[in-house]
UniProtKB/Swiss-Prot annotation:
The modification Dimethylated arginine is found at residues 108, 112. The lineage of its organism: Eukaryota, Metazoa, Chordata, Craniata, Vertebrata. Residues 163-240 are annotated as: Disordered. Residues 172-205, 214-240 have a biased composition (Pro residues). Disulfide bonds: none annotated. GO terms for molecular function: RNA binding; snRNP binding. It comes from the Eukaryota. GO terms for cellular component: catalytic step 2 spliceosome; cytoplasm; cytosol; methylosome; nucleus; SMN-Sm protein complex; U1 snRNP; U2 snRNP. Plays a role in pre-mRNA splicing as a core component of the spliceosomal U1, U2, U4 and U5 small nuclear ribonucleoproteins (snRNPs), the building blocks of the spliceosome. Component of both the pre-catalytic spliceosome B complex and activated spliceosome C complexes. As a component of the minor spliceosome, involved in the splicing of U12-type introns in pre-mRNAs. As part of the U7 snRNP it is involved in histone pre-mRNA 3'-end processing. GO terms for biological process: mRNA splicing, via spliceosome; spliceosomal snRNP assembly. This is Small nuclear ribonucleoprotein-associated protein B'. It comes from Bos taurus. It holds the Pfam family LSM. Residues 4-86 form the Sm domain.
Length: 240
């Protein structure tokens, strides 16, 4: 139900009210709520009822009962009167705690982090890592070496197959000279393409002086007197 602010019922909220019912009972309690049917809610309510004596000689006595929170039906309500003003403390009753007296301490909110004046704890020697940005490995050390090595080896193999000159790092000697029958000395022409070079000592190198001409090799007997020895290397024997 819509109730205006100027309603008399709203003006008596939290007052101590005396409610009289049709059967003569009286309810005294703190008025808290109501509705359009005049159903009431009373808290801290006490019930008072009059008991008639059996004999006419005895006086009528009144009985009191403590009920607490009560819901009264509006159809049984006869009248409502103000019993007293609202109590001073309408909140929840507080129970005093032992030792709750104020002390010398100061209440403050719990802070986050470490205060500025407290020194930072340090790790034991040997367990502390390098400072960020200082003492770490260089970029060259962290670069993977596998790719560069494989690429260099592949380039060297390709250059050797194609016949391109291989570049050697500074401080190292070049390739060793060719052994055996290599290129002819300067000023002389080599054999034409497709022909094998002639047998015998390399061109430009005199024959060995260890064995004179006409002497048999070591381990062979010389020919008997009057017979010619074998022809020198590179010459055909005479026809008979």
């Amino acid at each position: 139900m819509t109730v205006g602010k100027s309603s008399k019922m709203l003006q008596h909220i939290d007052y101590r009210m005396r409610c009289i019912l049709q059967d003569g009972r009286i309810f005294i309690g703190t008025f808290k709520a109501f509705d359009k049917h005049m159903n009431l809610i009373l808290c801290d309510c006490d019930e008072f009822r009059k008991i008639k004596p059996k004999n006419s000689k005895q006086a009528e006595r009144e009985e009191k009962r403590v009920l607490g929170l009560v819901l009264l039906r509006g159809e049984n309500l006869v009248s409502m009167t103000v019993e007293g003003p609202p109590p001073k403390d309408t909140g929840i009753a507080r129970v005093p705690l032992a030792g709750a007296a104020g002390g010398p301490g100061i209440g403050r909110a719990a802070g986050r982090g470490i205060p500025a004046g407290v020194p930072m704890p340090q790790a034991p020697a040997g367990l502390a890592g390098p400072v960020r940005g200082v003492g770490g490995p260089s970029q060259q050390v962290m670069t993977p070496q596998g790719r560069g090595t494989v690429a260099a080896a592949a380039a060297a193999a390709t250059a050797s197959i194609a016949g391109a000159p291989t570049q050697y790092p500074p401080g190292r000697a070049g390739p060793p000279p060719p052994m055996g029958r290599g290129a002819p000395p300067p000023g002389m022409m080599g054999p034409p393409p497709g022909m094998r070079p002639p047998m015998g000592p390399p061109m430009g190198i005199p024959p060995g002086r260890g064995t004179p001409m006409g002497m048999p090799p070591p381990g062979m007997r010389p020919p008997p007197p009057g017979m010619r020895g074998p022809p020198p290397p590179g010459m055909r024997p005479p026809r008979p």
